[in-house]
């Protein structure tokens, strides 16, 4: 094929209950794009029924598409290789293979999640965004670093779309339930406290779902439960996006996926981005949910940059993670022009939770950490979170010293302003030391974490930004900390750290992580925690 000419690609999307066919050219012009959603006769989607729907609907959509763009003009066939439901993926792959063979044109299987990101970039002005991808089967925070889209944060159990749909089914709402939850939520006027679970840049939604169902069963107004479910879950999503933003220092945030159609979620992210002084993008609704055009576009990007497949390579991958894909279509020279998040001059740091300023307390150098109000959260929830975390942080900074772990000294706590003044530590954060190639302290990190875990303390936000290395290594930022003797809580603590290292220090990951594990192994309980860690990583479903 002559790749110097304008290529036309047809894309087949069928990872769950939506069947999509799209045609796009290499200029990024969408020539055809239509999606049909399978609506089950009873609540819940059966994978086999969804696959049967694809088999019938692809034929119909293909006829419509080829009435717009004749078959002889198609140069390339692309399809969603995964992740998704096995039966749906197999029907989609079979359809794409059949067309590819019949017209003797090349075929490319692409990652469904990354397709969302790339069509979003095409349809907005985003260049290098931190992407929140939210749908029925996926909840991820993605960032491009080191020739891969890295999963910076994600759900530890169910996806946000699934959470909303399951709640809607429980309340006898039609499918897809998220639309009806949003509709009811607009008329809610009472906030009901529900579980709010953030662990580093990950979230857990299963406890929230169960609690919301119980509130509905206890005869709370459905409008109030929907309002509270949305406010809680979307605040969690916005918070982990903000945490990832602080960790990666990206200057753009983009929202994609089916749940991106929710106006309240868009509003919350827009407010957060304004507070962080970064740009916010969301593609038009047609390109938020699953569609064939996004599959076709990623197929073109990969093909034009050397990706080739034969039929043996087209077996679907139901657990096809975004970070399994080697990105060959983003030029390295782009990195030189990428913008970074700008920290206000009067601050020495601006995290997801707090503004950090330097000063003096009596004769001592100090820093002040103020948990500022978050405009994206409703007042009741925001006050609760900021107060709880301020008190927690002060408590745990004192508690870890009793375990022989170094931490800043607290000078003053202002509960009204959610502000802590503490000693200034001369040193560098671990993130900077690793970037410089200094890894001598990494084993000490493992020992410190082991000492915390033996003492029954789980940090819940372990990143390389939360250790300060000087003559000794200090641990900071305990706002998410808790007491726990559960092996799984300690395993998740390590997983949070592992993912943060992989996302930023990918080129040094093995060296850094192995040193941390060696240090952690000096404690007796380490073996059971490390084994549990493997089990937790295996059972992650939403990819």
Curated annotation (Swiss-Prot):
Cofactor comment text: Binds 1 Fe(2+) ion per subunit.
Function (record text): Required for the formation of a threonylcarbamoyl group on adenosine at position 37 (t(6)A37) in tRNAs that read codons beginning with adenine. Is a component of the KEOPS complex that is probably involved in the transfer of the threonylcarbamoyl moiety of threonylcarbamoyl-AMP (TC-AMP) to the N6 group of A37. The Kae1 domain likely plays a direct catalytic role in this reaction. The Bud32 domain probably displays kinase activity that regulates Kae1 function.
GO CC annotations, alphabetized: cytoplasm; EKC/KEOPS complex
First-tier enzyme category under EC: transferase
UniProt keyword list: Acyltransferase, ATP-binding, Cytoplasm, Iron, Kinase, Metal-binding, Multifunctional enzyme, Nucleotide-binding, Serine/threonine-protein kinase, Transferase, tRNA processing
Taxonomic source organism: Methanococcus maripaludis (strain C6 / ATCC BAA-1332)
InterPro entries for this protein: ATPase_NBD, Bud32, Gcp-like_dom, KAE1/TsaD, Kae1_archaea_euk, Kinase-like_dom_sf, RIO_dom, tRNA_threonyl_synthase/kinase
Subunit structure: Component of the KEOPS complex that consists of Kae1, Bud32, Cgi121 and Pcc1; the whole complex dimerizes.
Lineage, highest ranks first: Archaea, Methanobacteriati, Methanobacteriota, Methanomada group, Methanococci
Protein name as it appears in the record: Probable bifunctional tRNA threonylcarbamoyladenosine biosynthesis protein
Residues given in the record as ATP binding sites: 348-356, 369
Compartment(s) where it occurs, according to its Swiss-Prot or TrEMBL record: Cytoplasm
Region Kae1, residue ranges: 1-329
Entry-linked Pfam families: RIO1 (PF01163), TsaD (PF00814)
């Amino acid at each position: 094929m002559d790749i110097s000419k304008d290529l036309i690609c047809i894309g087949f999307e069928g990872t769950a209950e939506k069947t999509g066919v799209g045609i796009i050219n290499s200029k990024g012009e969408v020539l055809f794009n239509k999606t049909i959603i399978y609506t089950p006769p009873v609540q819940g989607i059966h994978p086999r029924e969804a696959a049967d729907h694809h088999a019938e609907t692809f034929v119909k959509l293909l006829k419509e598409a080829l009435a717009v763009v004749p078959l002889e003009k198609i140069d390339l066939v692309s399809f969603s290789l995964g992740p998704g439901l096995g039966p749906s993926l197999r029907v989609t792959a079979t359809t794409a293979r059949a067309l590819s063979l019949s017209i003797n044109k090349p075929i490319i299987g692409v990652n469904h999640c990354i397709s969302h990101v790339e069509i979003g970039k095409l349809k907005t002005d985003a260049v290098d965004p931190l992407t929140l991808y939210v749908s029925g089967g996926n909840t991820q925070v993605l960032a491009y670093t080191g020739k891969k889209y890295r999963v910076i944060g994600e759900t530890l159990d169910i996806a946000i779309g699934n959470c909303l749909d399951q709640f809607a089914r429980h309340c006898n709402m039609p499918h897809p339930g998220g639309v009806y939850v949003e509709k009811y939520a607009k008329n809610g006027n009472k906030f009901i406290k529900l579980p709010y679970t953030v662990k580093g840049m990950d979230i857990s939604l299963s406890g929230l779902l169960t609690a919301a169902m119980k509130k509905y069963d206890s005869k709370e107004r459905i409008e109030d439960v929907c309002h509270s479910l949305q406010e809680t879950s979307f605040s969690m999503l916005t918070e982990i996006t903000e945490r990832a933003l602080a960790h990666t220092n990206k200057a753009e945030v983009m929202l994609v996926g089916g749940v991106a159609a929710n106006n309240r979620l868009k509003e919350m992210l827009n407010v957060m981005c304004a507070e962080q002084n970064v740009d916010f993008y969301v593609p038009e609704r047609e390109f938020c949910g699953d569609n064939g055009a996004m599959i076709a576009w990623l197929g073109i990007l990969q093909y034009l940059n050397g990706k080739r497949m034969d039929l043996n390579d087209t077996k679907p991958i139901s657990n096809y993670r975004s970070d399994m894909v080697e990105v060959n279509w983003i030029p390295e020279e782009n990195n030189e022009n990428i913008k970074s998040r700008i920290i206000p001059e009067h601050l020495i740091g601006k995290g997801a939770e707090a503004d950090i300023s330097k000063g003096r307390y009596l004769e001592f150098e100090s820093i002040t950490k103020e948990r500022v109000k978050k405009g994206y959260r409703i007042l009741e929830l925001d006050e609760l979170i900021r107060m709880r975390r301020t008190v927690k942080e002060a408590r745990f900074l004192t508690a870890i010293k009793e375990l022989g772990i170094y931490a800043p000294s607290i000078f003053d706590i202002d509960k009204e302003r959610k502000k802590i003044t503490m000693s200034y530590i001369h040193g560098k954060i671990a993130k900077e030391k690793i970037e410089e190639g200094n890894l001598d302290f990494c084993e000490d990190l493992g020992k410190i974490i082991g000492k915390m875990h033996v003492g029954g303390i789980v940090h819940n936000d372990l990143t390389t930004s939360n250790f300060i290395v000087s003559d000794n290594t200090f641990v900071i930022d305990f706002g998410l900390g808790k007491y726990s003797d559960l092996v799984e809580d300690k395993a998740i603590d390590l997983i949070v750290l592992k993912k943060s290292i992989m996302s930023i220090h990918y080129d040094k990951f093995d060296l850094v992580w192995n040193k941390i594990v060696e240090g952690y192994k000096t404690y007796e309980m380490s073996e059971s925690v490390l084994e549990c860690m493997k089990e937790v990583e295996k059972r992650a479903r939403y990819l």
